[in-house]
Design a protein with these regions (language model features):
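Class I SAM-dependent methyltransferase SAM/SAH-binding core
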Residues: 33, 41-91
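A conserved beta-strand element that flanks and buttresses the S-adenosyl-L-methionine
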Residues: 105
Length: 220
């Protein structure tokens, strides 16, 4: 199984918080949907605490799903595991085993989507949640203020100094924007808050470290 926190040391606390809030808030035997399950690392953090949960993991490619099937066997606590190959840009074609979910999580997948697709997924998630359900989203944020960029550079240097591993850097704000390219498309925090509210979800910021955010959006 891939261990992403080895390359990005500040992720450890944020992912632990993600697992904690789902552990604390999803009911016994609840249904959890993971958008972009990959090989199952983040799902494993949750299921190691809550083997009773039914997990449905979606991923674009079959290869990581095959690995996830090995890494995430059916739980000793009674939870079942389902793996679905699906494209978040083609939501109508994704066939899910359950009609509704107590929680939906997504870690480091949204920045691959165009903003229009992000909004469509958020609306789809809102429709899929039971009343009181939550969407927990962990992803990069787009930096939008050139004047504040030196502060982000300082955070990156601190990570390298404290942890001995550099996450990334850019000489200036324009270089940062250029380096994002056409396929790395993080959204701004303000956009996420607007999109959540438009889908009638109540947003909250659970943890923010520079341009990496752990957010939630709850259904009334």
């Amino acid at each position: 199984m891939e261990y992403p926190i080895q390359r990005h040391p500040t992720r450890a606390e944020q992912l632990e918080i993600l697992a904690t809030v789902l552990d604390d808030t999803v009911p016994d035997g609840g249904r959890l949907l993971d958008l972009g399950v990959g090989t199952g690392y983040v799902a494993h953090l949750v299921l190691s605490r809550r083997p009773d949960l039914d997990l449905v993991g979606i991923d674009l490619k079959q290869e990581p799903l095959d690995a996830a099937k090995i890494n995430l066997p059916n739980g000793s606590g009674g939870g079942r595991r389902y793996f679905v190959q699906g494209d978040l840009n083609r939501l109508a074609e994704i066939a899910l085993p359950h009609a509704s979910y107590h929680a939906v999580m997504c870690a480091l997948t949204f920045h691959d989507l165009a903003d229009s697709a992000k909004q469509a997924v958020i609306r789809w998630v809102a429709d899929s949640l039971v009343p009181g359900g939550r969407f927990v989203l962990y992803d990069r944020l787009r930096l939008t203020e050139a004047a504040a960029f030196p502060l982000q550079q300082s955070l990156w240097r601190r990570i390298a100094r404290v942890h001995g591993t550099a996450m990334r850097d850019a000489e200036d704000f324009d270089t940062y924007v250029t380096d994002l390219g056409q396929t790395n498309r993080p959204a701004a925090l303000e956009d996420y808050l607007t999109w959540f509210r438009a889908a009638k979800l109540s947003p909250a910021i659970l943890h923010l470290h520079g341009n990496i955010a752990l957010m939630s959006a709850s259904k009334a």
